[in-house]
Amino acid sequence: MSRIGKKPVPVPAGVTASVDGQIVKAKGAKGELSFVVHDEVLVKMEDGAVSVDPRDQSKEARSKWGMSRTMISNIFVGVKDGFEKKLEISGVGYRAAMQGKNLQLSLGFSHEVVYDVPAGITVAVPKPTEIVVTGIDKQQVGQVAAEIREYRGPEPYKGKGVKYAGEKIVRKEGKKK
């Protein structure tokens, strides 16, 4: 079983953190985030680090212990540096473009797919076959990237579709005569 929860989360330079009951708040160069820790986990600030402990030794408390520590670590990294996910588009005629605040995707459908980018997330299209999703909330960045990928996930025969940068697509062999 993982013991990641035992390790206190150091507050990085340039980030101010506060613990108010079960709410951990972090403020940095990129913005401000807060996380509400579950009641089964005790949170305290000591010596420039946030430490978490389970209130009892139940399975639920111990599982939320490590998750809470990781979530607190993620909000510190988010307000300091931010998070980024890159997507690649492959396929003939498949491309992306920004149209105001919306992302317009041509993915082989009879219509253009228009994705409304949520607040707090920035989407950039450096090339027509590349999409870069950035933001301070790791969960939201991953969710937006997954929603964009879901429109046309990579298929196993030719590899066409939207995939994460560096993602390995398991290819299949086609029919044989």
From Swiss-Prot:
Top-rank taxon, per record: Bacteria
One cellular component (GO) term of this entry: cytosolic large ribosomal subunit
A molecular function GO annotation: structural constituent of ribosome
Family matches, as InterPro entries: Ribosomal_uL6-like, Ribosomal_uL6-like_a/b-dom_sf, Ribosomal_uL6_a/b-dom, Ribosomal_uL6_bac-type, Ribosomal_uL6_CS
UniProtKB keywords: Ribonucleoprotein, Ribosomal protein, RNA-binding, rRNA-binding
Pfam families: Ribosomal_L6 (PF00347)
GO biological process: cytoplasmic translation
Record has Acetylation as a keyword: no
UniProt function note: This protein binds to the 23S rRNA, and is important in its secondary structure. It is located near the subunit interface in the base of the L7/L12 stalk, and near the tRNA binding site of the peptidyltransferase center.
Subunit note: Part of the 50S ribosomal subunit.
Family recorded in the similarity comment: Belongs to the universal ribosomal protein uL6 family.
Name under which the protein is recorded: Large ribosomal subunit protein uL6
Organism in which the protein naturally occurs: Brucella anthropi (strain ATCC 49188 / DSM 6882 / CCUG 24695 / JCM 21032 / LMG 3331 / NBRC 15819 / NCTC 12168 / Alc 37) (Ochrobactrum anthropi)
Gene name, Swiss-Prot/TrEMBL: rplF
